[in-house]
Amino acid sequence: MAVGKNKRLSKGKKGLKKRTQDPFSRKDEYSVKAPSTFAVRDVGKTLVNRTTGLKNANDSLKGRIFEVSLADLQNDEDHAFRKVKLRVDEVQGKNCLTNFHGLDFTSDKLRSLVRKWQTLIEANVTVKTTDDYLLRLFAIAFTKRRPNQIKKTTYARSSQIRAIRKKITEIIQREASTRTLAQLTKLIPEVIGREIEKSTHGIYPLQNVHIRKVKLLKSPKFDLGALLALHGESSTDDKGQKVEREFKEQVLESV
């Protein structure tokens, strides 16, 4: 056997593990901010890889969509079945400024609404807001018993369903086309549903009338000023003020 060569010593090196770097050490944390139309602005945190070379962290964040419960945004448990989608449009410092991207119902809520002995009426309307957002709103409604009704079933006739659907379309078109996206997001949860229920009472009594889904089809050209105004961070507030100082004439003492 050759001198200085020990096979037993060299065997141990095979079992050594490679050093694994923690993937979170290369990431930064950013705060997600909701528009000022909601009661709670802080949505949460999101992680992104740090800016390295040509890969910019801001570019990775822009376009991200977050799904948040409306109950958390409004501090109201009555809205727990509504899910709001927020899209990151701008990154300022460590804050991600978001805008409304859509709304949906939880599947368990939708399933709980559908029952026997009643008619389900659905309608969808494509509308354009005053600030050029193209949206598609999906409405859902159910028939209910009339006062002092003995009959178990509450089925509406085809002519009544058509009349109700026409009324729903008219109300949504009227409410959405005369408002901005920010104003419309305030009306969608409750106001439009109550308006439909009230106006269709003469055709057939309705219950559980909701805008179950809002889909954003097209957005206008990105406007940073409009987004900052939506977040209450308008650049006009940061302008400097002119300072007026009292002029004092210098008095020279005679020698």
Curated annotation (Swiss-Prot):
Keywords: Acetylation, Cytoplasm, Ribonucleoprotein, Ribosomal protein
Compositional bias segments (type: Basic and acidic residues): 19-28
SMART domains the record matches: Ribosomal_S3Ae (SM01397)
Lineage top rank: taxon: Eukaryota
Keyword Plastid annotated: no
Family: Belongs to the eukaryotic ribosomal protein eS1 family.
The protein's name in its UniProt record: Small ribosomal subunit protein eS1
Gene name for this UniProt entry: RPS1
